[in-house]
Amino acid sequence: MDVSNETVERTDLRTPLVDPADTEVKPLPEVGLESVLTESSLSYRRRVYLGACIELKVLFRLALPAILIYLVNSGMGISARVFAGHVGSQELAAASIGNSCFNLVYGLMLGMGSAVETLCGQAYGAHRYEMLGIYLQRATIVLALVGLPMTLLYTFSYPILILLGEPKTVSYMGSKYIAGLIPQIFAYAVNFTAQKFLQAQSVVAPSAFISAAALILQILLTWITVYVMDMGFMGIAYVLTISWWVIVGSQCFYIAVSPKFRHTWTGLSWRSLQGLWSFFKLSAGSAVMICLEMWYSQILVLLAGLLENPARSLDSLSICMSISALSFMVSVGFNAAVSVRTSNELGAGNPKSAWFSTWTATFVSFVISVTEALAVIWFRDYVSYIFTEDADVAKAVSDLCPFLAITIILNGIQPVLSGVAVGCGWQTYVAYVNVGCYYVVGIPVGCILGFTFDFQAKGIWTGMIGGTLMQTLILLYVTYRTDWDKEVEKARKRLDLWDDKKEPLQN
């Protein structure tokens, strides 16, 4: 079938995107977007207006719950540190080290799980519903296998922390805290694959409600274990692990019993054991892409500890990074939404819809990020007092706010384009771009400006902004030059390989 020249059936634009009375998940292409964009009798402005009305409705329905999910997931780690801080300063340091160490496996599992977005999203758009369950099982197996060496690594966290120069007391307490978090590794393996399985079908709100309920449960149980059962900071670790497994169990139960998924989840299958290596290669590219992005800002904070006034530099940069991370969650929500939209439309053979979804999400996220950046500049002299009462730190934060504003704007574009890459299956290519822009250009230039030319924190941040800007411009150019008809054909070939029971490979 020639999908690039296929005539898409016109639908009534008054038809709602999702029929409230329908209990079965329906594919997104049958909503009129492609027919609007290809309707020659309508003027260009009219097509854009009607297409935007359709797309924005879908986009925000996906992005808002996704933003809530990522905020809640971050909130679980933050609440654990808050309780640890009330137990004692050493406990806070141990919990902070433990959570920071677990960001490694969190980013790894989140990145590998994003491969499910590519395959499930395209299979769903192409009406290959039975393959979604196969992809879900295969991804869970691969991530669980990757979790085994990570478990071994965290089991020996004490000597590793000592080797990294941490104090013995903090290293010992941190290693005990990490031991209580180890079961989370396998919770991540199931959670992120199940979450992407749901997102590929535009089912996002249930995960948001489950995550919010788990956060409330975590806060309640942590209070009980710390103040009633007197379990100390180890009780905080145990409750955090239990809370993640509550999320996993709730999502799996929802998938198993909901009639929405009777076509996409048909039970366990031996087919999930086929092609594990090929899936690992695709998911490894996703993991590298996301991990390199997550670690980039952390390196900025680490380098600040080497400056002339490390305490003030660390405090000011940590405050700026906290604000940046909060705004970044909005972009990550749009990242998830555009990944679903792009993969769905490519799988359905709708090149114009995939193109329109890409640029609509990019524009909306850019506008939001500019608004956030302007707010940061406007309140630059006051925002730091949310975190500290130190006037010197507040002054340093105010001086860094222009750099923070630029970072926020770039972070409003770059994650969305990364979401497009996931939807199209470009993870490995973007990983190479990230390595070059971040670690070959951004960090070395930042070190030269910060240490050699003595621009201190501003110099380091300038170099890293340069790396992010270069990466963003490359992704913008690649996305602009994309032949969406060819991407549709690639998606079709990737899915057609399953008819021969072969593994769909990344193009």
Swiss-Prot record:
GO biological process, one term: xenobiotic detoxification by transmembrane export across the plasma membrane
Cellular compartments annotated: Membrane
UniProt entry keywords in alphabetical sequence: Membrane, Transmembrane, Transmembrane helix, Transport
Any one GO molecular function term: antiporter activity
Bilayer-crossing regions: 58-78, 92-112, 141-161, 178-198, 209-229, 233-253, 287-307, 318-338, 359-379, 403-423, 433-453, 459-479
InterPro entries (alphabetical): MATE_euk, MATE_fam
Pfam families given in the database record: MatE
GO CC aspect terms: membrane
Its membrane topology: Multi-pass membrane protein
The family this protein is said to belong to: Belongs to the multi antimicrobial extrusion (MATE) (TC 2.A.66.1) family.
Name of the featured protein: Protein DETOXIFICATION 39
Originating species: Arabidopsis thaliana
